[in-house]
Structure formats: C-alpha cells, structure tokens
Amino acid sequence: MKIAVAGSGYVGLSLGVLLSLQNEVTIVDILPSKVDKINNGLSPIQDEYIEYYLKSKQLSIKATLDSKAAYKEAELVIIATPTNYNSRINYFDTQHVETVIKEVLSVNSHATLIIKSTIPIGFITEMRQKFQTDRIIFSPEFLRESKALYDNLYPSRIIVSCEENDSPKVKADAEKFALLLKSAAKKNNVPVLIMGASEAEAVKLFANTYLALRVAYFNELDTYAESRKLNSHMVIQGISYDDRIGMHYNNPSFGYGGYCLPKDTKQLLANYNNIPQTLIEAIVSSNNVRKSYIAKQIINVLEEQESPVKVVGVYRLIMKSNSDNFRESAIKDVIDILKSKDIKIIIYEPMLNKLESEDQSVLVNDLENFKKQANIIVTNRYDNELQDVKNKVYSRDIFGRD
C-alpha cells in the first residue's frame, strides 16, 4: 500500500518507519535537511529505535519536499503536523493540519486522510463539514518523545475513528489502518477500538490530562513533604505500593512540561467552555504553583549562602532524560521567575551553541567551569556527572527516572 506521511517529527517519522516495514511510505517535510537525513538512512530526531531501524532494517521509505506528488499517489495520507497551543485565542493552532487537508483533497480524490496530530474535540466533524467529505478520520497517538517507535511497536491500544454513516470505503480504510498498526506491532493482543471521532479526540485529551493530574498530584505531595520536612521518598513509596495507585509516573519534578501535557490540558480546559468543572482548571493552576514554589526554594537556598556573588547554574534545559528538545520545559519558567528577581543564571546545555539574543542568561558548556561558577546547581533530573558537586545540587528527582 502507498502511504504518505505529512510531518517528520517523532509522531510522523515513527509511524513512517513502522509502516514502511510492509508498505511503501513517503515522508513529506518542508525542511531539506530533514529530507536529506531520512533519505540517507539517518534520523533527524533522537530516538534509539528509529535510528536503528533506518540504519539496519529493510524499509520501503523515502522523504520528499514535493508534497503534491506524494499525496497524489497515496492510498492513505497520515497527517502528523504540529498543533501548538495559541495562548492568544486559548486554542490549538490547527492551520498546518488544515493546509495539508486542503492540499491532499485538491490532488487526490480517493485517499482517506488520517489525522495523528492532537486536535480539539469536534475538529474532525468541523473539517468534514468544511470540506464536504467523510474521508477525514482521526487516530490518536500515545507516544513518548525519544521512545516513539518503541511505543508504536508495543502499543497500549490502537484507536481509529469511524462514524456509523460513513461510506463503505472510509469504514474499510479505518479498519485497514488499525490492522496495519496492529500487524506491524511486536506486542500480541493489542486492544483495537473503533469509535466516533469526537470520542477519539476526547480520549487523547483526557488521557494526557490524567497524566498531568498524576504529575501535579505527586508534585503537590512533594511540596508538602519538603515544606514540613517529611521524607518524600518514603511517603510516595508507601502510597504507590497500593496496586490501585502503582509505582509508576510518581517521581516529583519541577512541573509537567514537554510538547503534549501543557497544551493538551489547556485545550481540554478550553473545550469545557461552559461545562461545569474544577479539577481540569486546578491541574493547570497546580503546575504553575509548583514552578513558583521551586523558584522560591532556590531563592531560599541562595539567601542562606554567604557568597557576595550568587549564581544559579541550570543543568540541562531538556524536560526528560534522553530528550532532544526543550519545548515547554518546566525549568524555563523557573528560570524566568529567577531572572525577574535579578538573579544571575548560567546554563549548561550541550545541545545548544548559543542562547536567544534577548536571553540574559549565560551559556557555559564546559561542565567543570559550570560547576565552579555556580553557587547552586538546579536540575529537574539528576545525573551522575554531578556526583562530585552533589552538595551544590537542588533537585526534586527522588527516584532517578522520568
């Protein structure tokens, strides 16, 4: 089967690699550097499994800048373009998705379009009405950055949307796509759910908001424990051994961040509109309170020091271990709070060559020099290369994992 994938981020590329094991896949991107890397068997993103598969597996995959040619020949078109949250309108910016839909429909009269981008509840219905077609369906992704292909190979569930009154072809394509994902997976007995588009859209936003809730819960627990001088590790362990709660996703942090949780929680809150709720709003608020609390704790530690020059060293901007981006990283908001108090900030981030021009922080990418300059070293996730200056480190990383 010929499949086109719009977007070579971790969602689009991982799906492209997965499906190219048994199908002919063309990745469409607007960046020549990404296209060149994929065509040379290199991954433009950090993902161990994607890197290995591109290098070692027999894949039928190519990348192109020529979107029209790719879409024209495709039987299925997967859309995995960004939908960043627009704080001005308090809604996802879906313009990239809509642009692809319009372009595909202009050159292809038969392909079914499968949206993998995270979208607002009701978006598929809106697009079907706007473009007067039922050939637009939704399949939410549940992937982690840096482990996207692994999560596609071992999925927790597969969800594809379809409506009762859809044409036989669209119904067949929805089932076919679900089967493609299931047959490419290494995990056996993966649950497959076919549901309405609005239900599928809701699953995605509510799932990520629950994860954000869990992060916020253990962060608030940790805030209480640190404030009352309790052993947070012991309290969390004592709670988490209850099978109903579980010993997972319970490691305190500076706040939830990354590409998905911040924007998805805000979008779900926006979707509630006039529907009664308090919990969803509280999750978003809790994350902001946590970051303010962390900044205050750092300031308190600084004030206890006698040094006339007080420098906060931020070790890594990445949100998670082994990540390769800083999108919505909680530490960035903590830095902004500290800078508003005229505190000098130095940053160790080997993935950066320079900071943005308006940034008042200083990039120090010699680790030993960084350690010497900083009065306190702040890190969301602890790393063993800080072991020799452990007495300088402030972190709420209790379990040494994400």
Curated annotation (Swiss-Prot):
Pathway(s) annotated for this protein in UniProt:
Nucleotide-sugar biosynthesis; UDP-alpha-D-glucuronate biosynthesis; UDP-alpha-D-glucuronate from UDP-alpha-D-glucose: step 1/1
Catalytic activity annotation: UDP-alpha-D-glucose + 2 NAD(+) + H2O = UDP-alpha-D-glucuronate + 2 NADH + 3 H(+)
Q: Which UniProt keywords apply?
A: Capsule biogenesis/degradation, NAD, Oxidoreductase
Q: Which residues bind NAD(+)?
A: 2-19, 29, 34, 83, 118, 145, 259, 263, 327
Q: What is its EC number?
A: 1.1.1.22
Q: Which GO terms describe its molecular function?
A: NAD binding; UDP-glucose 6-dehydrogenase activity
> Which superkingdom does the taxonomy of this entry point to?
Bacteria
GO biological process annotation, one example: UDP-glucuronate biosynthetic process
Which Pfam families does its entry note? Answer: UDPG_MGDP_dh, UDPG_MGDP_dh_C, UDPG_MGDP_dh_N
Residues binding substrate are: E141, F142, L143, R144, E145, K204, N208, Y249, N250, N251, P252, S253, G257, K320
User: Which InterPro entries does the protein's record reference?
Assistant: 6-PGluconate_DH-like_C_sf, 6PGD_dom2, NAD(P)-bd_dom_sf, UDP-Glc/GDP-Man, UDP-Glc/GDP-Man_DH_C, UDP-Glc/GDP-Man_DH_C_sf, UDP-Glc/GDP-Man_DH_dimer, UDP-Glc/GDP-Man_DH_N
The catalytic site is made up of C260
Q: In its keyword annotation, does this UniProt entry include Membrane?
A: no
Which PANTHER family does the UniProt entry name for this protein? UDP-GLUCOSE 6-DEHYDROGENASE, UDP-GLUCOSE 6-DEHYDROGENASE TUAD
Family the UniProt entry places it in? Belongs to the UDP-glucose/GDP-mannose dehydrogenase family.
Q: What this chain does, per the record?
A: Catalyzes the formation of UDP-glucuronic acid which is required for capsular hyaluronic acid synthesis.
UniProt name for this protein: UDP-glucose 6-dehydrogenase
